[in-house]
Amino acid sequence: MAAWTLISMLIIITVSDLKYMVIPDKVLLFFLPLIIIERIFIPLSPWWDSLAGGALGFGLLLLIAIISRGGMGGGDIKLYGVIGLAVGVKITILSFMIATFLGAVIGLTALAFKLIEKGKPIPFGPFIAAGTILAYLYGDGIISIYLSLFY
């Protein structure tokens, strides 16, 4: 059930961000209580992982927005707070790494082929959605492969 709630939210966010470059607060406020209720009845282990994930997701993107002076939108910041509540710390970190990698590769490719102009903003929501879904579904395997490269 939690996966369907998360995926439903990410689909709506992706469409909205691609079409309007906005992640609506109304969408996040609709899904936030659903995710909180799900985490009460289906808690992560340890129980505080959801709270820490939400704080980390929100705080990390807020820090990036401050450092980049607006390079990250408010919707992205709030979205990662909700995602963190849903998936916890480990998957939030992996999701962010995957989203950043996908955004960089696709953004640089689009620049190289002149599909977008330098300095023009691109929506990050679809990359957040893709990174979150990949991390949620395959996170443990991805982390195991990554760690096996070094240990």
Could you tell me what each predicted segment is?
Residues S8-V105, I145-Y151:
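Functional transmembrane core segments of multi-pass inner-membrane proteins
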Residues Y20, F124-F127, Y138, Y146:
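Aromatic side chains
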Residues M1-A2:
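Transmembrane helix-loop-helix
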